Amino acid sequence: AEENKGNFVTRLEDGTYKRIVAAPKPQKIVELETIRTLVDAGQVVIAAGGGGIPVMEQGIDLHGASAIIEKDLTCGLLAEELNADTLLILTSVEKVSLNLDKADEEFLGGISVE
């Protein structure tokens, strides 16, 4: 059914199905100046998280893209554009991992900038 709509579906190892969508590298933050104004005014801003819909510019209009926001790259871009001293990523998982939900998933106990 989803394939007939132009969507891609894959079967996971546990037998369930998942719709596959693109997660393109973010190019820019659309509301950057609004966010900058709030930060400069001393407000706590929560932005660039999951659940948002990426958009594409078409002329002077913005149109939703059939994709997901790659939130780690997006918040990194936002921090860079704001010249942030600190980037704090909050998550509900016990540990960050590589290869999430795959047989070779590896949990990271700690990471450094080196």
Which role fits each region the language model picked out?
Residues 1-8, 12-44, 48-114:
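Active-site phosphate/oxyanion-binding loops
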